[in-house]
């Protein structure tokens, strides 16, 4: 029985392999202690005499039977010679029912060898995962340690999104505001461009209208200066030239006065005239006082002296011996001077002086009758049979003067040729010194009441009553009376300015043209020859140069065919060729 107990107690101890399996099962949940287990296992292999009494301390207490000092003490060994029991069956199974309860409850059934291999593989994979996780953390730490600005990971993502949305919204608002500003600026520029275009159109229309008016005024000025060849600057007392040929064309001309001066004062020596007018006039010397009236021109005022050897004693006696009042004496002076000029019209000097007198009186805007009036042509019927020479430089002026008798002038619209017989019967042939035998003073009284000065500005809008002007430019009267509306008004039409409407036909003017054939039609101006052209044709004729042509008869024939125009007396080219053909 004692032997059995000893065997039983010896069988309760575990072999080293069993101890290793037990430790592995117990330490399966503690991987870091594997090295310690391996160390303990190695110690257990090197020390087989250790007992399992002190497992927790890493060494086993040996029983007295396993003492190495007693080789025959019956210690357990791998060799058969070391076993104390020679007849011991090694295949003896010590496991009996209920033997697992002898040493206490185990944490779990012992795993098999296959399960142990799986656990080892699992432990190896876990170790590898732990090592890879450490490497990853180490790599993250290395990446975070790079130089430069690190992203702010502390702020939440929602806050960053809100800031991004606010920035985008502000950008869109600025963009929309910029677009609105650009659209507003474009609208303003478009409006300014439209206004500028409209203003340019109005200014362009106004310029066209002014150009039309300028052409109209130039046309009127050409009627006064051209046509007869006389300019406003050449109409002065000392103008002894060929420009004096058309003095009987009845043009109403005056030079433009200086600012602040009355018209005509520079022609008649205004300061001297004013000083002479301020002197007291008495009845003893009416010739010296009344001869200074600007509207009355005598031979003494033109020539200053009788250097031409003309008989002027009769006119001088008629003036000096008359103690009548001033107005009749002035009229007698003018009448005697004009009759003296008409009686000596055959000589070139007298004809030129008479034309100078007419020119000065018209330039001074005095309303006295010209040399074509009946009062100055008292002795024309007596003097017409005298032969006149046209070889001097004033021959053209004399020829044009006789040819101009076919037309009237401003003061005497009746032509001198038609009113010759009437003027001879109603006007005395010789001037008398008595005031009762002379006609009324006429318009000279008005001129003298104004101090001898006549202001043509008062009659600036006056027009000559000639049918030729009315027939050619009849619409200008209505343009002045009813001017065009303002350019800004809606009733204004720009086409009316650019293309003026032709004037309507005047029935009264057509009737007058039918009755009076002495008016030049506007469409036949190219076929009309002026006095200058007729005189040039006469000079080109050899018989005229030799003196074989009767100029008086030729002038009378041309006068019967003459027509009146705004530029003077004109004759149809066909009539001139017929008359000159008969003379040849």
From Swiss-Prot:
The record's keywords, sorted A to Z, are: Cytoplasm, Disulfide bond, DNA-binding, Nucleus, Transcription, Transcription regulation
Query: PTMs?
Result: Depending on the oxidative stress inducing agent, yap1 can undergo two distinct conformational changes, both involving disulfide bond formation, and both masking the nuclear export signal, thus abolishing nuclear export.
The bZIP domain, residue ranges: 154-217
> The motif Bipartite nuclear localization signal: which residues?
35-42, 68-75
Does the keyword Nucleus belong to this entry?
yes
Residue ranges for the region (Transcription activation 1) are 211-332
Q: Which family does it belong to?
A: Belongs to the bZIP family. YAP subfamily.
State what protein this is by name. AP-1-like transcription factor yap1
């Amino acid at each position: 029985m004692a032997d059995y107990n000893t065997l039983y107690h010896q069988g309760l101890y575990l072999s080293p392999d069993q101890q290793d399996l037990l430790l592995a099962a117990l330490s399966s949940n503690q991987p870091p202690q594997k090295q310690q287990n391996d160390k303990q296992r190695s110690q257990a292999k090197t020390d087989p005499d250790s007992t399992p009494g002190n497992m927790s301390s890493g060494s086993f207490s040996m029983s007295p039977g396993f003492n190495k000092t007693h080789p025959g003490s019956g210690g357990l060994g791998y060799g058969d010679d070391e076993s104390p029991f020679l007849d011991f069956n090694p295949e003896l199974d010590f496991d009996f029912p209920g033997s697992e309860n002898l040493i206490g409850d185990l944490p779990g059934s012992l795993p098999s060898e296959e399960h142990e291999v799986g656990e080892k593989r699992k432990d190896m994979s876990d170790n590898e995962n732990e090592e890879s996780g450490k490497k990853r953390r180490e790599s993250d730490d290395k990446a975070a340690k790079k130089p430069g600005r690190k992203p702010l990971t502390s702020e939440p993502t929602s806050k960053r999104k809100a800031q991004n949305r606010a920035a985008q919204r502000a950008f869109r608002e600025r963009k929309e505001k910029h677009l609105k500003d650009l659209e507003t600026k474009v609208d303003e520029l478009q409006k300014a461009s439209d206004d500028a275009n409209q203003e340019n159109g109005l200014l362009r229309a106004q310029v066209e209208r002014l150009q039309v008016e300028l052409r109209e005024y130039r046309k009127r000025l050409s009627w006064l200066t051209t046509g007869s060849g006389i300019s406003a600057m050449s109409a002065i007392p000392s103008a002894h030239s060929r420009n004096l040929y058309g003095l009987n064309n009845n043009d109403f001309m005056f030079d433009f006065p200086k600012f602040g001066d009355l018209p005509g004062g520079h022609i008649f020596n205004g300061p001297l005239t004013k000083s002479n007018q301020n002197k007291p006039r008495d009845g003893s010397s009416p010739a010296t006082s009344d001869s200074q009236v600007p509207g009355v021109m005598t031979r003494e005022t033109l020539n200053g002296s009788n250097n031409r050897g003309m008989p002027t004693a009769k006119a001088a006696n008629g003036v000096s011996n008359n103690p009548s009042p001033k107005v009749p004496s002035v009229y007698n002076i003018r009448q005697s001077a004009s009759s003296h000029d008409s009686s000596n019209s055959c000589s070139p000097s007298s004809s030129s002086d008479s034309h100078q007198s007419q020119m000065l009186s018209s330039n001074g805007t005095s309303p006295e009758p010209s040399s074509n009036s009946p009062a100055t042509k008292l002795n024309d019927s007596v003097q017409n049979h005298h032969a006149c020479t046209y070889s001097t430089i004033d021959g053209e002026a004399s020829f044009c003067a006789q040819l101009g008798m076919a037309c009237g002038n401003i003061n005497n619209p009746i032509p001198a040729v038609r009113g010759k017989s009437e003027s001879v019967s109603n006007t005395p042939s010789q001037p008398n010194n008595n005031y009762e035998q002379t006609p009324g003073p006429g318009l000279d009284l008005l001129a003298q009441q104004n101090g001898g000065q006549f202001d043509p500005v008062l009659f600036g809008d006056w027009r000559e009553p000639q049918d030729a002007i009315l027939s050619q430019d009849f619409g200008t009267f209505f343009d002045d009376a009813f001017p065009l509306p303002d350019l800004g008004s809606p009733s204004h039409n720009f086409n009316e300015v650019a293309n003026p409407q032709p004037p309507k036909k005047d029935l009264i003017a057509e009737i007058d043209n039918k009755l009076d054939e002495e008016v030049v039609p506007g469409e036949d101006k190219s076929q009309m020859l002026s006095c200058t052209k007729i005189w040039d044709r006469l000079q080109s004729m050899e018989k005229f140069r030799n003196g074989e042509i009767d100029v008086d008869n030729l002038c009378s024939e041309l006068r019967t065919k003459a027509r009146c125009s705004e530029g003077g007396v004109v004759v149809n080219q066909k009539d001139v060729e017929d008359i000159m053909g008969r003379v040849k």
